[in-house]
Amino acid sequence: MQMVISRSAVRDGLVAVAVVGSIALGAVGCAGGDDKAPKAGGEFVAGTLLCGGEAVSTEAAESLKVITGASRFEESDEDSTVEHAAKQLSQEFTSSVTGDGDICQVFAIDAVQSDRLEVTWELTGGPPEGEPAPKFTVLRMGERALAAPDAGVVQFACRNEKLLGSQPAHVDVGVERWSPKEPEGDPEKLKDAYATVAHSVSLAMAKELGCENNGGLQARPSLDPA
């Protein structure tokens, strides 16, 4: 049984878990059919073409293979892009310093409905505070990055007076596995993989938002613990 952690809980160092078991999967089944059936989709593409084609670097695509064991994935929907998410985020920031939304979902070839990666964004209202949950390793990227064997988060401050006004937007980009199975593989390699994917999407988001200095994110991920 896989335990998933909310974005706010990760940021605040609180472990708020939802058990993906028979009840949760039953809810998915009611909404979208048999969760154990193969995901009905269209074309399958390389990892670098996911989430709009600008979000996943070659290095991050290799990391997706470490996480899922696959190198081909269901093509993302038209609105499941960094460009679309950045527009949502900037619109949300004009009325509130907090909010969240989806960027895209990643289904490996032959994946079932209940086994996916969710890539999300969140406006946190301020820089990171407190200690993260024990499962996470803190990395030096942006304001703070967190890596676990089943999730990665990069937190950065975005300054763009034309788009966002005088106050910086504090953005979390998260990559999390929702699955009935426990993570498989070397935990440290999985941590690096999640951090790499989260960094790649975060950098794409920072560029799309026009953040000053790309939100403090470098061209490649920093995987050494802080």
Question: Model-predicted segments: where are they?
Answer:
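Bacterial N-terminal signal peptides that target proteins for export
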Residues: 2-17
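Bacterial signal peptide processing site
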Residues: 31-34
